[in-house]
Amino acid sequence: MVVTMRAALRLMLISTVSLELIIGILANVFIALVNIIDWIKRGKISAVDKIYMGLAISRTAFVLSVITGFLIAFLDPASLGIGIMIRLLTMSWTVTNHFSVWFATCLSIFYFLKITNFSNTVFLALKWKVKKVVSVTLVVSLIILFINVIVIHIYTDRFQVNMVQKCGANNTLRAYGLFLSISTVFTFIPFTASLTMFLLLIFSLWRHLKTMHHNATGSRDVSTVAHIKGLQTVVAFLLLYTVFAMSLFSQSLSIDAQHTNLLSHFLRCIGVAFPSGHSCALILGNNKLRQASLSVIFWLRCKYKHTENQGP
């Protein structure tokens, strides 16, 4: 009975992860397509749409790399002990996750600079050059990625030496745990940047509401609504990214347990929620994407009713 219950829970968790991955692919492909079609129609693309498109493309690549890793672990687990396979999987995961997270961080920075109002000279200079700020942020992130790749490369080489000296599944698990630990450390950099944007947005909103109160003006003006929308976008990223980072950290701590246990599947389940859930939150929070999604849903409903009417 206990075995049956464990098997049912395991199947449920695996099904949940699979559903999250499918939603992640669909949501991110949708975001990319909407922005590409709009770009073709208008002949130009805004800075924020570029960020959305870059985020969607990198997220799609990230989810595909996760799916590839899961399939290899399921179909040919022995290959995970091969050095070149470990290098390919870790590098693809690292690069795609890096751009996925940093594009989301750039989105937080963009909203912060566009929405908030501070009289500081440095802030005003950054506000007028928001595109350059985003570009510089991405360049800095490339330097961080380079360091991250070097660190992983060094430890992958050490792992290959250990594999020659003593083989076994424990070595593969330790290498995986070490990779997760390194990834967790590097995730705190963009997380800290987004958290800073979040706190400054709250401070800016508080100042704005205080000014509105002194002037005896309604609190639901354009600036207030913009602040709240910006906060919603950043909060969605922070909450889901916190869950993602905690998932990575927890997996690195529980790495001595077998990969087939329920805890491992549960941690993967909550970790995969980040690239899927955040993209869905972006669709709901962006007027253009939300309208496009409603149009698609309406079209699918009409298509379904038309098919039903033509049925036997």
Swiss-Prot record:
Query: How is this protein annotated for GO cellular component?
Result: membrane
Alphabetically sorted, this entry's keywords are: G-protein coupled receptor, Glycoprotein, Membrane, Receptor, Sensory transduction, Taste, Transducer, Transmembrane, Transmembrane helix
One Pfam entry name:
TAS2R
Q: Which residues are glycosylated?
A: 170
Q: Which residues lie on this side of the membrane: Cytoplasmic?
A: 38-65, 114-133, 206-229, 286-312
Transmembrane among keywords: yes
- Which membrane topology term applies here? Multi-pass membrane protein
Q: Name one GO molecular function term.
A: bitter taste receptor activity
Question: What InterPro entries would the database entry show?
Answer: TAS2R
List localization entries: Membrane
Q: Which GO terms describe its biological process?
A: detection of chemical stimulus involved in sensory perception of bitter taste
Q: Which residues lie on this side of the membrane: Extracellular?
A: 1-16, 87-92, 155-184, 251-264
Q: TM spans, by residue?
A: 17-37, 66-86, 93-113, 134-154, 185-205, 230-250, 265-285
PANTHER family from the xrefs? TASTE RECEPTOR TYPE 2, TASTE RECEPTOR TYPE 2 MEMBER 103
Role, per record: Gustducin-coupled receptor implicated in the perception of bitter compounds in the oral cavity and the gastrointestinal tract. Signals through PLCB2 and the calcium-regulated cation channel TRPM5.
Q: Which family does it belong to?
A: Belongs to the G-protein coupled receptor T2R family.
Give additional notes from the record.
Several bitter taste receptors with distinct ligand specificities are expressed in a single taste receptor cell.
Output this protein's name: Taste receptor type 2 member 103
Organism of origin is Rattus norvegicus (Rat)
